[in-house]
Amino acid sequence: MKLPIYLDYAATCPVDERVAKKMMEYLTVEGNFGNPASRSHKFGWQAEEAVDVARNYIADLIGADSREIVFTSGATESDNLAIKGAAHFYQSKGKHIITCKTEHKAVLDTCRQLEREGFEVTYLNPKSDGLIDLEELKNAMRDDTILVSIMHVNNEIGVIQDIAAIGELCRARKILFHVDATQSVGKLPINLAELKVDLMSMSSHKLYGPKGIGALYVSRKPRVRLEAIIHGGGHERGMRSGTLPVHQIVGMGEAYRICKEEMASEMPRLKALRDRLYNGLKDIEETYVNGSMEHRLDSNLNISFNYVEGESLMMALRDIAVSSGSACTSASLEPSYVLRALGLNDELAHSSIRFTLGRYTTEEEIDYTIELVKNAVAKLRELSPLWDMFKEGIDLNTIEWTHH
């Protein structure tokens, strides 16, 4: 077993060796390096064929038509293109958008930008388990609502939203439905032939593909129109100009192909490992799981260890790579806005650790992690005056702290 142990697969994944090998065939002069938009020679034709094959693999995994896949630089761009593109195209119908407070920043900040442009956004509060109240969503819908954007799986707490039910509500009101599926594609079965989803964002690097490439599913039936953000040569049916990075697209396609083959056996394996981790940690006193355990991705565990400061716990756990909050915002010392939206107080939100498991996680690594966390929590609580007060039965909420 090698240290440090990587348990931050929701932040990114290593590129699968099979994917890297495939990508190498599309880079050098010995390989297939052509521009897929070059229609006048073999180099271009071969590159175009490689892109088509990859596009089919991606469509196959999610039950879509390959013509519905638009390549982007990643899920952040896909979120931007979906939300801004739809808002700008359909603004004559209305300027109201609905999303949730626990969405990824790529969705929330895009909505904030649209607010600056005169759109109105309703931010739904999740329930304490992280799930959305469908009645609340229904009540938030108005005649001028043009778009609902709700993620499939939350990146911090792994909670799975009922996108089938949300899709039905949206379709009944003729409102476009965008799903950020960055954390769910390849980990949960998704069939867009059945789901009433109009737009769906996807990433490659959360699925053992390369960084810097992603895709947006844009429904053809019913047809969804978008206003482009990036203009140029009119690539990707005019929705996203720019020379296609063939090696990255091939990598993403191969990663999605592998996931389709291995998902049925891989997810139960990860669930067993995640449950082993949970069972090893749940008996630590004052430990709380954040988000629904029932409606949750099999590879995610987000736990708060009360009376332990999150950053010091991260330092004590330097032999394992975990995170507090998402990678995109973990550089700030603010407590996770996702956990705050669930109603956690600052202390509990600050003491949360996200463990996310993946393809290379082993049983040995999980057992090592359990022991390490147990010892670290015990050690840090020994140093904590708050823990002593709690053990003495003092209600910390009744104490008035002096502010310096």
From Swiss-Prot:
UniProt enzyme class: transferase
Keyword RNA-binding attributed: no
Binding site for [2Fe-2S] cluster: C328
Pathway field: Cofactor biosynthesis; iron-sulfur cluster biosynthesis
Gene Ontology biological process: [2Fe-2S] cluster assembly
Bridged cysteine pairs (disulfide): none
Entry's Gene Ontology molecular function annotations: 2 iron, 2 sulfur cluster binding; cysteine desulfurase activity; metal ion binding; pyridoxal phosphate binding
CC annotations in GO: L-cysteine desulfurase complex
Modified residues (N6-(pyridoxal phosphate)lysine): K206
Active site (catalytic residues): C328
Keywords annotated in UniProt: 2Fe-2S, Cytoplasm, Iron, Iron-sulfur, Metal-binding, Pyridoxal phosphate, Transferase
A Pfam family recorded for this sequence: Aminotran_5
Sites where the protein binds pyridoxal 5'-phosphate: A75, T76, N155, Q183, S203, S204, H205, T243
Main location: cytoplasm
Function: Master enzyme that delivers sulfur to a number of partners involved in Fe-S cluster assembly, tRNA modification or cofactor biosynthesis. Catalyzes the removal of elemental sulfur atoms from cysteine to produce alanine. Functions as a sulfur delivery protein for Fe-S cluster synthesis onto IscU, an Fe-S scaffold assembly protein, as well as other S acceptor proteins.
UniProt family annotation: Belongs to the class-V pyridoxal-phosphate-dependent aminotransferase family. NifS/IscS subfamily.
PANTHER family membership: CYSTEINE DESULFURASE, CYSTEINE DESULFURYLASE FAMILY MEMBER
Name of the protein in question: Cysteine desulfurase IscS
Organism field: Pasteurella multocida (strain Pm70)
